[in-house]
């Protein structure tokens, strides 16, 4: 879940709020998934779907805004490719439900925060944190 503010008929990232959170929480590190625009893939109806040019631009802009905010607030940044954390947890080829189930199993205190399918990003964030902690010998 990312905080947003109105921007005409759309919404955009609230980087001021993200910066305020970084000051309040004073994290040792920020782990950001190194994502890319969605390629053309088959949809449930068999039709191919992909991210359009405008969507790709907005997605890339939001990714850049998050990274810039983290760097501007002097928080060490770790970029994590989805393949890295998914392979670490044996989730190659998994879907969002499997990722969420594993996060809740490994980190039971996360369960109240991952109750809906749309909360898969929270599960991903938990697993990325676990990937980093394992990599650093923290777990």
Explain the meaning of each model-derived region:
Residues 1-139:
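Phosphate- and other anionic-substrate recognition elements at nucleic-acid/protein interfaces
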């Amino acid at each position: 879940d990312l905080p947003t503010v109105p921007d005409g008929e759309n919404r955009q990232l609230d980087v001021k709020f993200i910066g305020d959170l970084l000051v309040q929480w004073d994290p040792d590190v920020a782990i950001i998934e190194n994502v890319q625009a969605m390629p053309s893939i088959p949809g449930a109806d068999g039709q191919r779907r992909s991210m359009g040019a405008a969507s790709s631009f907005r997605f890339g802009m939001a990714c850049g805004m998050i990274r810039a905010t983290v760097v501007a607030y002097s928080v060490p940044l770790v970029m994590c490719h989805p393949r890295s954390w998914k392979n670490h947890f044996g989730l190659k080829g998994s879907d969002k439900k499997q990722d969420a189930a594993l996060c809740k199993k490994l980190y039971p205190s996360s369960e109240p925060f991952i109750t809906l399918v749309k909360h898969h990003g929270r599960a991903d964030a938990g697993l990325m944190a676990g990937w980093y902690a394992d990599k650093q010998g923290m777990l």
